[in-house]
Amino acid sequence: MTAKISVILTAWQRPQYLEEQVDRVLRQTVPPHEVLLWYNQPPSALGFFKRKQLLEFRNADRVKKIVCDYNFGIIPRFAMASAVEGDYVCIFDDDTLPGERWFENCLRFVDQEKTLCGTIGLRFLSDSEPKTEVPRMGWAGRNEKIEFVDLVGHSWFFRREWARYFWDTEPLLRSFGEDIHFCAMLQRHGIRVACPPHPQDDTSLWGSVKGDLGVDKVAISCSKDRSQEFREVLQYEVANGWRLMLL
């Protein structure tokens, strides 16, 4: 029986990648049941034609669109995960272009290991400062086997019923740290966090085949110095019971 996967994409400032991202999602070896696009009102500086690209693109007729005239930020995609039709959910950042076997890769582990899967994995070296192991797991570290971590980002693959745990407690911020919050909430329910294999010689399994896009100038983590927010969210979740692997 084919897994029923709902995909949630975000449209905001990267219209140049959306068409390829949709193509790559639709070409998965385990095809998605549905693809939803959350359209956050982009900044006016983006320009009319680029904003239009976020709604009119190849295969747009195969994508369900939620169009907002306001930028609600990064939280809604996790909120809407409970309302989709699939048994599994995969949320993508708008800079993430998966290999064609990414869903297949995640499905090997999500139930067997009871784990949230992501394409970049971090293990913290401090419970008060945003210091992590280098390299990160995933397309950066190119791990040959599954690696359990504290935090995953860029793509999140999980069982739909786990989405409700995001709201066990309110996240500290609505503009940053949703990935940290979700991982911390899942831990309360015995759900681990992992980065599936990203072998050097098989990019079809990777969660993103163009990882450098995640550090461009419009990336939330790079658009300004977020170290203070990162520090605050980390300390908040640790104070509320989040246990870090190496500490």
Question: What is each residue range found by the language model?
Answer:
Residues 1-24:
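N-proximal low-complexity "stem/linker" segments adjacent to membrane-targeting elements
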Residues 4-6, 34, 181:
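Cell-envelope/extracellular polymer assembly enzymes that use nucleotide-activated donors
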Residues 17-21, 168-247:
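C-terminal catalytic/acceptor-binding lobe
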Residues 23-33:
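Short, acidic, metal-binding catalytic loop of nucleotide-sugar glycosyltransferases
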Residues 68-83:
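Glycine-rich, basic loop-to-helix element that forms the pyrophosphate-binding segment
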Residues 81, 99-170:
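Conserved catalytic core of nucleotide-sugar-dependent glycosyltransferases
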Residues 89:
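Short aromatic/hydrophobic "clamp" motif used to bind/position activated sugar donors
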Residues 93-97:
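The conserved acidic donor/metal-binding loop of glycosyltransferases
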